[in-house]
Amino acid sequence: MAIRLNPKVRRFLLDKCRQKRYGFLFLGCIFAILYCMGTWPFFAKDIVHDPNNLPYSLQDYSTDKDEPFFRGCTDTKLYLQNPAYSKMNASFVMLTRNEEIEDVLKTMRSIEGHFNKWFKYPYVFLNDDPFTDHFKDQIQAATNATVEFGTVDEIMWEFPAKVRNSLQFKASLEDQNDRGIMYGNMESYHKMCRFYSGIFYKHPLVSKYEWYWRIEPDVDFFCDISYDPFFEMAKHNKKYGFTVLITELYWTVPNLFRTTKSFIKKTAGLKENLGTLWKLFTFNYNILDTDDEEISRWVNFPWDAKPKLTEKLMVDFLLENHGQVNNEEDLEGIQYLVERARSKVPMLEDSLEGEDYNLCHFWSNFEIARVDLFDNEIYNAYFKFLEESGGFWTERWGDAPIHSIGLGMTLDLEDVHYFRDIGYRHSSLQHCPKNALQSQENLNTFDEGYNFGCGCRCVCPKKGEDIEDHSTPCMDIFFELLHGREYEKEFPGCYKPSIKDKDVIEEIRRENFRVIE
């Protein structure tokens, strides 16, 4: 069953106008929005739109590239007894502090009740200070699984001495605070982001495992997880799993993509071997297949092509007639010519080689992944390159966009799994799936089941929005890659133009034959 995509282009464009430093005038953005409303179907005609505008949470997204491992509950007892099943070399990982004990216990009660009471995977707790006996006793009393406590040493946790003792370091944090960057003045937050970006997987308590499941203090799980996510990931050749896909705040990472592109350029063979997951995190401005370099400079979005090529045809027609004005269409040609003379070429300040970071990222507060996704030559070199650039303190680079972009360089879309069936809340963001339509115990206790549902004994919050329906444009892009025409098995490190100028010109000719004949 194909998902019916909901285009949210108008809202997305307004967000881009606010977040990005494009050299477009506001009226230009409004024009693009209005034009897009009328022309989007021409450029996205392969996509099936839902006439009822159903939210994603009421649809089935499954394709041969990704789908829930199970729809609804499986018999956990029989699952564990299956000879084909084997427990994986995996653990939970949490970075926390002694004073967060109550929030840690809240998370543990939730994950134990919904999953680990059956599977008993070990926990690894890390802290930049030693854990107290009180903390350890409370944690060990909350589970029958193995628990390990580790300290993050100074080399792993602290910025190099020459950095943290410099005036520039302190000035950078103060500047971020003055500009209202979220957590920008919190040195500990910068350290945490740096640690999770490229160091946590080297800690001896983590590196001995093949898989990890990152959890945080103060987390709620809303559904039972009646199967082993680690085992199913391995069985289905998945390497990274997520529940939330959202956009980053632009001013926390203004130079992250520029630095990443520099790394790609300096790493032999990397550009030619970028994974197809790269397309989930980047905008493509190489839209139009044309030999006209002047036109290509003006066309950066699908909705740019038709008006710019119409303008070109109008002007060409007028010039061929030596500027004679014989009718209303000729007058339009003159108006186009005047507008072109007055206009400036659109300036995309963050565009690099026709690409830009779209700010989408997997929310790394929840991630289930192979440890060697990060502990490998390419990713380690990437982290080192980022570290040397100083962005972890001159800006407020988060581990989530770094993980995502790093994985985009090496993984294909099929390597990633969306844990849609796992209900999850952390901070103000939450996702909770619809229950599957199947026999469930105590039906009055759990939410109603649906034929498109996949959750197992879910009890979703009555308040709050599901991030799946409101993460624009990230979920739109993800589902389109799973279903739409944009997906390419072979991705030679760069985008191919998706629109041929000849096709657009032919469309214009059919609509406006009097103007150009």
From Swiss-Prot:
Its EC number is 2.4.1.-. It is an enzyme of class 2 (transferase). Residues 45-517 are lumenal. Glycans are attached at residues 89, 144. It is found in: Membrane. It comes from the Eukaryota. Coiled coil: none annotated. InterPro entries: Glyco_trans_15 (IPR002685), Nucleotide-diphossugar_trans (IPR029044). This is Probable mannosyltransferase KTR7. It comes from Saccharomyces cerevisiae (strain ATCC 204508 / S288c) (Baker's yeast). The gene is KTR7.
